[in-house]
């Protein structure tokens, strides 16, 4: 599969037998646009919402109809699933790379943190990414691949619009809505995925990894392939 290079199999016990667990269990087969459109919203629409604008990705769907009626728009289909997962990365100095004979996948060239009003916590990646780009002396046009964690579809679209992402470069193998969101591991997970995808694409020189954090925070890192 697409993620084989970045997945470490774990042996688990199924009944009386130990078997390798090496495939994500969250992605679901048989999902249709019609089924998605029938799902009920999860959260009430607040009259205090800073930006009640609705983004409709399917034509037609029940999502737009719900929006027109002031009904909830976030559903189980356009929100990330909470699942189990772990990820690991190694960050080393240039001296350590030379001393231990390491072969780095990429160099960290920019990073940033930002905070926004908790009511719009999902857009935290916007100030964080702008800060990281500034530190690296780059613009968004210099970025070849983006891994941006998806809390909800509306949240990720808001970030993409504010940062003017080229969507052909974003979450090219699926984001948290498709793959799931292992809380506490998503930051490392999207970096692992980003670096592996950069290795597969000769033209991909630089990548951006960013995600929102509860309470209004956002974090972003930029990598250059070695």
What are these regions (language model features)?
Residues 18-23, 118-125, 150-168, 182-187, ...:
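Short glycine/threonine-rich loop-to-helix capping motif typified by GTGT followed
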Residues 94-142, 160:
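Glycine- and Gly-Pro-enriched alpha-helical subdomains that act as flexible
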Residues 2, 102, 138, 165, ...:
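Helix N-cap/coil-helix junction residues
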Residues 1, 30-33, 76, 80, ...:
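Electropositive phosphate-/nucleotide-binding environments in soluble metabolic enzymes
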Residues 1-94, 99, 162, 167-169:
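N-terminal extracellular/periplasmic Venus flytrap/periplasmic-binding protein-like
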Residues 72-80, 112, 144-151, 170-186, ...:
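Cysteine-centered functional microenvironments
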Residues 33, 37-40, 88-95, 126-130, ...:
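Predominant activation on well-ordered alpha-helical scaffold segments within soluble catalytic domains
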């Amino acid at each position: 599969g697409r993620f084989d290079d970045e997945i470490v199999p774990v042996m688990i016990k199924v009944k009386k037998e130990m078997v390798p667990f090496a495939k994500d269990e969250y992605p679901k087969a048989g999902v249709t646009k019609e089924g998605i459109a029938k799902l009920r919203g999860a959260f009430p629409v607040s009259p205090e919402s800073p930006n009640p604008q609705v983004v409709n990705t399917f034509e037609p769907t029940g999502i737009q109809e719900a929006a027109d009626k002031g009904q909830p728009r976030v559903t189980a289909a356009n929100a990330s699933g909470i699942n189990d997962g772990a990820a690991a990365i190694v960050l080393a100095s240039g001296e350590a790379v030379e001393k231990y004979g390491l072969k780095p996948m990429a160099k960290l060239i920019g990073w940033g943190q930002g905070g926004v009003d908790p009511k719009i916590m999902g857009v935290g990646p916007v100030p964080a990414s702008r800060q990281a780009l500034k530190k690296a002396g780059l613009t968004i046009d210099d970025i070849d691949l983006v891994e941006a964690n998806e809390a909800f579809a509306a949240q990720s679209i808001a970030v993409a619009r504010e940062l003017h992402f080229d969507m052909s470069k974003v979450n090219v193998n699926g984001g948290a809505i498709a793959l799931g969101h292992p809380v506490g591991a998503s930051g490392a997970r999207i970096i692992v995925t980003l670096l592996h995808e950069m290795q597969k694409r000769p033209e991909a020189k630089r990548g951006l990894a960013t995600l929102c954090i509860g309470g209004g925070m956002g974090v972003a890192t930029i990598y250059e392939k070695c």
